[in-house]
């Protein structure tokens, strides 16, 4: 579920978040069945498909709304995320700058942001930024792709 978290404005809009005025991060809330995929595996995918070493930036997108952050739901997720950060910190040339914070209020993004890649595959950002990440995921996690 696409959305926003970690800011200090109630019911933020994409327009306000994207301008950096709410302190929210653009996030994805993942609902998962641990019998199918573990939280640890989700964390591995997280490290695979984005750059956790650049502060407040993902590709050409710059600002705190693009920060690398893991919002955890409970102490077990926090411990697993801490262990994952420690493990993956040896895999990158630069230090991991990903924040690890308790989940504040999650605000669901506008309808047009849900399933954005699926609904807009020809859009420039989707074809040049998202598509290569999806292909990298599919190549690494073939068994998870339906």
What name fits each language-model region?
Residues 1-146:
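Flexible coil/turn and secondary-structure edge motifs
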């Amino acid at each position: 579920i696409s959305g926003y978290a970690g800011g200090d404005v109630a019911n933020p809009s994409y327009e306000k978040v994207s301008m950096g005025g709410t302190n929210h991060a653009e996030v994805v809330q993942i609902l998962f069945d641990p019998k199918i995929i573990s939280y640890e595996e989700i964390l591995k995918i997280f490290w695979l498909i984005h750059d956790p070493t650049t502060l407040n930036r993902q590709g050409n997108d710059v600002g705190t709304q693009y920060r690398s952050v893991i919002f955890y739901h409970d102490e077990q997720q926090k411990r697993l995320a801490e262990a994952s950060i420690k493990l993956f910190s040896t895999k990158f040339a630069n230090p991991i700058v990903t924040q690890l914070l308790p989940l504040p209020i999650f605000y669901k993004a506008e309808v047009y942001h849900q399933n954005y890649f699926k609904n807009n595959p020809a859009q420039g950002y989707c074809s040049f930024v998202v598509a290569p990440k999806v292909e990298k995921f599919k190549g690494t996690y073939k068994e998870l792709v339906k």
